[in-house]
């Protein structure tokens, strides 16, 4: 509701006088209207806010009025971690629970495209696993290696992609050095694929 939005803005010293507030009768209508605004080019991004995920996603994936593309829908957390020098995108920890290899290609490309939209100067994707070496007994390491080869061959574009990497050596230069990992992504990743 307008009054609540205005009160929160005032309480936090935020001037929203020049911003449009779109009122709707209920949460499902809010999701539908938000998706329509993006489709019409009047909004550039969707923010879930307090909507339930299923309400928002129902509007997003609706065939006639949603935001479907040729790729699978995926989720990205965009985080500003004060102790890390780069903004981080973490994908996909919310929508695709057990993605296939094809799904992972879409998830990675979606995150890369988001990073470019957010004007990351260089996109460095770390495909995470429990370890940073390829192990035939650990399927996620094999998939990570295959995804990197797909990036090498232009099937995933717009970023430097490396994996498998463990979380510590994906974001810590110290861990990268200790484990002697030669990688342009290790220790400097700004997209983490979980």
Please give the residue ranges for each predicted region.
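Anion-binding alpha/beta catalytic cores of soluble intermediary-metabolism enzymes, centered on
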Residues: 1-194
């Amino acid at each position: 509701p307008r009054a609540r939005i205005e009160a929160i803005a005032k309480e936090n010293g935020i001037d929203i006088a020049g911003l449009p507030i779109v009122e709707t009768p209920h949460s499902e209508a809010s999701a539908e209207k938000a998706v329509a605004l993006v489709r019409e080019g009047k909004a550039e991004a969707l923010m879930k806010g307090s909507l339930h995920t299923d309400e928002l996603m129902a509007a997003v994936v609706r065939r006639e009025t949603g935001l479907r593309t040729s790729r699978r829908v995926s989720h990205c957390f965009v985080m500003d971690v004060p102790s890390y020098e780069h903004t981080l995108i973490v994908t996909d920890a919310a929508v695709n629970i057990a993605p296939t290899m094809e799904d992972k290609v879409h998830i990675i490309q979606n995150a890369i495209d988001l990073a470019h939209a957010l004007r990351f100067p260089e996109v460095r994707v770390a495909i995470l696993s429990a370890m940073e070496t390829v192990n035939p007994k650990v399927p996620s390491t094999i998939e990570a290696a295959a995804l990197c080869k797909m990036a090498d061959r232009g099937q995933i574009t717009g970023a430097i992609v490396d994996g498998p990497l463990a979380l510590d050596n994906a974001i810590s230069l110290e861990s990268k050095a200790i484990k002697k990992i030669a990688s342009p992504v290790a220790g400097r990743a700004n997209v983490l694929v979980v």
